[in-house]
């Protein structure tokens, strides 16, 4: 029983954190971390606004149902707004009729494919080693040290000017101190061919600038704030039931604890008269 209780506690604590094991990514405190952590509804709404107005141009979320925007524990947007929002997205081919129709709230978010489009963000925030995601999601990024809300946040704010070792004329590539698997020019490598820069170059340009969106709640739209908000939103998109699972884990811990106490007291009452007496 003690081992079972310890296992339950360990599973809850390990499952509640969202940090992926990557020493190159500084930790960032999110409201949903920890045993008692939960999503900040206002932050999820701001994050959805950033995704919708900025990120969705190049990144899809094809595994996320649009209707979940109205669910409890998430952005909890008005169902009427969600229906209208879905109808304004890219049209979809109906599976039954084969004809083009407006997207419904029961459909998934659109996907983005083609030259210049980025990876799907449906489960990018799942920070689990060995998690490869649904088929076709391109989640091999996780095996390369990418993924998790901390990574997304640090990546978005990680764009910097080219280091001094970079040659002139690196057009179409952008240096990011968090991005570890991109290209590195020979001038930024040592004699052994090992890069001397902390980060590398990505094809994706810096996605955010200050005041790029206007938050409805009046929150200043700094790059740092928008990066935090969209990272939290993508975590919710990947783990919409995270808080519910934590609550179930807490209930299980309490019940296991009570059961352990009851078993101890029962054992003591039944066997105490016989213990210590020699035959």
Curated annotation (Swiss-Prot):
The keyword Transferase does not apply. Keywords: Cell membrane, Electron transport, Heme, Iron, Membrane, Metal-binding, Respiratory chain, Signal, Transmembrane, Transmembrane helix, Transport. Binds 1 heme c group covalently per subunit. It is a single-pass membrane protein. Heme c binds at residues 55, 58-59, 204. Pfam families: Cytochrom_C1. InterPro entries: Cyt_c-like_dom, Cyt_c-like_dom_sf, Cyt_c1. The chain crosses the membrane at residues 248-266. It is found in: Cell membrane. Its main location: membrane. Residues 1-21 form the signal peptide. GO terms for cellular component: plasma membrane. The keyword Cell wall biogenesis/degradation does not apply. One of its GO terms (molecular function) is electron transfer activity. The main subunits of complex b-c1 are: cytochrome b, cytochrome c1 and the Rieske protein. Component of the ubiquinol-cytochrome c reductase complex (complex III or cytochrome b-c1 complex), which is a respiratory chain that generates an electrochemical potential coupled to ATP synthesis. c1 functions as an electron donor to cytochrome c. This is Cytochrome c1. The gene is petC.
């Amino acid at each position: 029983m003690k081992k079972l209780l310890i296992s339950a506690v360990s599973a809850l604590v390990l499952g509640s954190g969202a940090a992926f094991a990557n020493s190159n990514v500084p930790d960032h405190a999110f409201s949903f971390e920890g045993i008692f952590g939960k999503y900040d509804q206002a932050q999820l709404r701001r994050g959805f606004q950033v995704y919708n107005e900025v990120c969705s141009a190049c990144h899809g979320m094809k595994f996320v149902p649009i209707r979940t925007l109205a669910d409890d524990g998430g952005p909890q947007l008005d169902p009427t707004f969600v229906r209208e929002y879905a109808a304004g997205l890219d049209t979809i081919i109906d599976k039954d009729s084969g004809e083009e129709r407006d997207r419904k709230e029961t459909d998934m978010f659109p996907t983005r494919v083609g030259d210049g489009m980025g990876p799907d963000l449906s489960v990018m925030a799942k920070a689990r080693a060995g998690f490869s995601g649904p088929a076709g999601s391109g989640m091999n990024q996780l095996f390369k040290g990418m993924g998790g809300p901390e990574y997304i946040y640090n990546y978005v704010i990680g764009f910097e000017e080219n280091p001094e070792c970079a040659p002139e004329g690196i057009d179409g590539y952008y240096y990011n101190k968090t991005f570890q698997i991109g290209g590195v020019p020979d001038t930024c490598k040592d004699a052994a061919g090992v890069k001397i820069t902390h980060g590398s170059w990505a094809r994706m340009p810096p996605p955010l600038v200050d005041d790029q969106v206007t938050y409805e709640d009046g929150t200043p739209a700094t790059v740092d704030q928008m990066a935090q908000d969209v990272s939290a939103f993508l975590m919710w998109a990947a783990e919409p039931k995270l808080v519910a699972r934590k609550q179930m884990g807490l209930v299980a811990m309490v019940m296991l604890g009570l059961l352990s106490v009851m078993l101890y007291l029962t054992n003591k009452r039944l066997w105490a008269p016989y213990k210590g007496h020699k035959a």
